[in-house]
UniProtKB/Swiss-Prot annotation:
Its EC number is 1.1.1.410. Pfam families: Epimerase. It catalyses: D-erythronate + NAD(+) = 2-dehydro-D-erythronate + NADH + H(+). Catalyzes oxidation of D-erythronate to 2-oxo-tetronate. Can use either NAD(+) or NADP(+) as cosubstrate, with a preference for NAD(+). It comes from the Bacteria. It comes from Haemophilus influenzae (strain ATCC 51907 / DSM 11121 / KW20 / Rd). NCBIfam families: ErythonDh. GO terms for molecular function: oxidoreductase activity. CDD domains: Gne_like_SDR_e (cd05238). The keyword Oxidoreductase applies. This is D-erythronate dehydrogenase. The active site is at Y143 (proton acceptor). InterPro entries: DenD, Epimerase_deHydtase, NAD(P)-bd_dom_sf.
Length: 315
């Protein structure tokens, strides 16, 4: 298979690339990684080609997406708080760049599997207790609006046969390795990751805030499953809420002490930030997993296992 990953130097792009290259049931002949900084090929694998490219002005992209391209994972984006602070950059990066790629697919290879990483931020406002696949999106942030626009565009391009698109809405990913970023949800990983490394972290939200989470490894496994799904009927809705589980910040901290003891909480300071709390609180905290599980997507069993997974794979 020939596969393209945008956002290829990001945390998810790198983990997805490494996992794809190690797969036995997906044979990768050519893996192209694209980002605004030149990505690094995992393990210097000779099957990987890396390109520095700004997808707002994608000169040369039509030479990388060809008739031989089997799939594109479009992960590149600027994150929620950054898009809120700089909406013009957000619309150019998160929406117009997506349309640029879709137009190249339409011209060069309308049969390509186009997998788009969407977000819980497409929801907001007064939500039902449990989100269904039929729940309308009502974003309350610029980032969420941009993701919702992309979802509609990809579904329309899929309906018209311009691409073979699948939109996967990601739960909040926890625990991410590395450093905090500008995402409103960055604290979700930070309040676990930093204390596990013996460092201090700030929790800017209420302990009662409920979140919808998935581990990095499960999200990557679900990306690869989306690659292998049969094409959906042209007139069906090509958006899937990836499975997750519901947990409060308080429960997360309790599970952390179960794994590492009460003393680890000394590394966590509570400094309430109304802006961050309001953004994250507007996202759904419970989603009906029925359809996604029926399609074969995976879900984590509990949060303690997520902590153990981070300790095993990322420390």
């Amino acid at each position: 298979m020939k596969v393209v990953i945008t956002g290829g130097q990001g945390f998810l792009g790198q983990r997805l690339a490494k996992t794809l290259l190690a797969q036995n049931n997906v044979h990768i002949d050519d893996l192209i990684l694209i980002d605004v900084v030149k990505p690094i090929a995992p393990n210097n694998d000779p099957r990987v080609r890396c390109y520095e490219m700004n997808l707002r002005y994608p000169t040369g992209l039509d030479e990388l997406i060809t008739e031989e391209t089997d799939a594109i994972f479009h992960l590149a984006a600027i994150v929620s708080s950054h898009a809120e602070q700089d909406p013009d950059l957000g619309y150019e990066t998160n929406f117009l760049a997506t349309r640029n790629i879709l137009e190249i697919c339409r011209k060069n290879n309308p049969k390509v599997r186009f997998i788009f990483s969407s977000s819980l931020a497409i929801f907001g406002g007064e939500l039902p207790e449990t989100i269904l696949d039929s729940t309308a999106f009502t974003p309350q942030s610029t980032y969420g609006t941009q993701k919702a626009m992309c979802e509609l565009l990809i579904n329309d391009y899929s309906r018209k046969g311009f691409v073979d698109g699948i939109v996967v809405r990601l739960p909040t990913i926890c625990i991410r390795p590395g450093k905090p970023n500008k995402a409103a949800s960055s604290f979700v990983s930070s309040i676990m990751r930093e204390p596990l490394h013996g460092e201090d972290a700030v929790c800017p939200v209420s302990e009662e805030l409920r979140l919808w989470l998935s581990s990095p490894n499960t999200v990557v496994a679900n990306f690869i499953h989306a690659l292998q799904l049969p094409s959906l009927p042209l007139r069906s809705w090509h958006t899937i809420n990836l499975p997750g589980f519901s947990v409060t910040v308080k429960q997360m901290l309790s599970d952390l002490t179960q794994v590492k003891g009460e003393a680890i909480l000394e590394h966590i300071k509570f400094e309430f930030d109304e802006s961050i709390n309001n953004i994250v609180a507007s996202w759904p905290s419970r989603i009906d997993n029925t359809q996604a599980l029926a399609l074969g997507f995976k879900v984590d069993s509990n949060f303690q296992n997520v902590i153990q997974q981070f300790i095993e794979y990322d420390m």
